[in-house]
Design a protein with these regions (language model features):
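Conserved PLP-anchoring active-site segment centered on the Schiff-base-forming lysine
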Residues: 94-110
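PLP-dependent enzyme catalytic core of the Aspartate aminotransferase-like
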Residues: 4-5, 9-10, 331, 338, ...
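Conserved N-terminal alpha-helix of the aminotransferase class I/II PLP-enzyme fold
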Residues: 38-85, 92, 107, 115
């Protein structure tokens, strides 16, 4: 391969970091050495310069517009990933009773609950789908009690499940991790106290975490011993610039939001996502001979993360069955990669395969995957 040559693009089904819109990548490439006539890359800009100020302001404005964020909410660009929010939420919200309600629908909600417990919060797991391998989202119509907040993970990347409803909370602030579904659908922000999303699945490269928080939940007095960097007020007061923000990631995030707007906003993107997911689920549910099956139950299926097994994943624990299952899964992933379909290996807790079809994944990518799956099934039935 010669310098300057570009390899053929693959379809990247990674759970995150994930694919970005090609036109956004091309635009960023054009501006790499000279952004907005400044004669410098965003990578080189001072975060307090007049060159960067409009970049972060634009990103914030686009979040507010596309997500219809009410004026009494702050938009923050933080660091530390979604996992840091597992601590920031209880440190800033568990201030009265010291109690919180968690609905446990997968690994990430479970980790969030464990982090809160570590900080001395009385955590009540009020519902869980662990009994069925997190293959569904339990229905909790209303959350009530002496809780400082209630916590959910709106989309579960590992298990491929998603909330089809928003629990009523009787005035209790509802916190939601929307890392893997942010702007994949319309969401009524006013029903939540805090929303947060790591950017690396649907918004930008890894490095920034979007936090949307109702202003009355931003306290001057978090739990004793809370580090300055883990206080929401620290960042709200400084416009997300208490310390140096991830400037380039925020720049790309703004470009992705512009792309989403051109696609019709959250509603337009959601329609495309439904079409992609339905195409794949239809094949999984109706493939000849039942070679494949989806793992998530109908009514809880994610539009973003589609998890599936082959007929060789029987649940048998004998050595021969396990060896055959491993062989087929490995063969599928390897041959898919050779066909330009990468990062399809399922999480170790579920096994099988996982196709993450986030906003930037085109329908053609899903169609290419299904065609490969048909061929693989014929050759390995």
């Amino acid at each position: 391969m010669q310098i300057g040559e570009v390899m053929a693009r693959v379809y990247n089904f990674s759970a995150g970091p994930s694919c970005l819109p090609e036109e956004v990548l091309e635009e960023c490439a054009r501006e790499m050495l000279d952004c907005n006539g400044t004669g410098q890359s965003v990578m080189e800009m001072s975060h307090r310069s007049s060159a960067f100020e409009p970049i972060i302001a634009h990103a914030e404005s686009q979040v507010r517009k596309l997500m219809k964020v009410p004026e009494n909410y702050k938009i923050l660009f933080l660091q530390g990933g979604g996992s840091t929010q597992f601590a920031m939420v209880p440190l800033n919200l568990a201030l009265r009773s010291g109690k919180a309600a968690y609905i446990q629908t997968g690994v990430w909600a479970k980790k969030a609950a464990a982090e809160a417990k570590k900080l001395g919060i009385k955590v009540d797991v009020i519902a869980s789908s662990e009994d069925k391998g997190y293959s569904y989202v339990p229905r909790v119509e209303k959350i009530s009690g002496d809780y400082d907040y209630a916590y959910i993970c709106f989309n579960n990347t590992i298990m491929g499940t998603h909330y089809e409803y928003i629990p009523e909370t009787d005035g209790i602030p509802l916190v939601a991790d929307i890392s893997s579904c942010v702007l994949s659908e319309e969401l009524d922000v006013s029903k939540f106290g805090v929303l947060f999303a790591g950017a690396q699945k649907n918004l930008a490269p890894a490095g920034v975490t979007l936090v949307i928080i109702r202003e009355d939940l931003i306290t001057e007095n978090p739990r004793p011993g809370t580090p300055t960097m883990l206080c929401y007020k620290t960042h709200a007061d400084e416009g997300s610039m208490y310390n140096t923000p991830p400037c380039y990631t925020i720049y790309v995030l703004g470009k992705v939001l512009d792309w989403i707007e051109r696609k019709g906003g959250a509603a337009g993107i959601h329609a495309l996502n439904v079409e992609k997911a339905q195409y794949l689920y239809d094949y999984l549910d109706n493939n000849p001979g039942g070679f494949y099956r989806a793992t998530a139950q109908k009514g809880s299926r994610s539009l973003m993360n589609v998890t599936f097994l082959t007929k060789y994943s029987t649940g048998a624990t004998d050595e021969a069955s396990l060896a055959k299952e491993k062989e087929i899964n490995s063969k599928f992933v390897k041959q898919a990669e050779a066909a330009g379909l990468v990062n399809l290996k399922g999480h170790r807790l579920v096994g099988g395969m996982r196709a993450s079809i986030y906003n930037a994944m085109p329908l053609d990518g899903v169609k290419a995957l299904v065609e490969f799956m048909k061929k693989f099934a014929e050759e390995n039935c």
